[in-house]
Amino acid sequence: MIVSNSINQMFEEMRGWRHELHSIPEIGLEEHETSKYIKSKLSEFNIEFKEGYANTGIVARVKGSKGDSDKSIGLRADFDALPMPEKNEFKHKSKNEGMMHACGHDGHTTMLLLSLIHI
């Protein structure tokens, strides 16, 4: 598989994003800090977004550079966590007692952010 150099160069930064998201799990419809973090990344990369869907949801939009088209593609990631204690002991373990990203949403959200940056 060929990985673009620009993506490869962002590996450590992306790992940091995933670790940050992992450390701030929040249950569904209450992901205020998570939503804030995602919006900060979208703003950092000048990606247009709208917020407030289902309380904390975000919709981002990336337009192509080859003219106006009515074609589109949808990508999505959940970013809610599970109401369960985290028993891991790494630096980026959950800061929120009784909540954990145990199903990969921290990784999925990181991959979606990367996709938006590189589309």
What does each of the following model-derived ranges do?
Residues 2-101, 110:
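Acidic/His- and Gly-rich active-site-bordering loop/insert found
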Residues 117-119:
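Conserved small/polar residues in nucleotide/adenosyl-binding loops
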Residues 114:
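Active-site signature of alpha/beta-hydrolase-fold catalytic machinery across serine-
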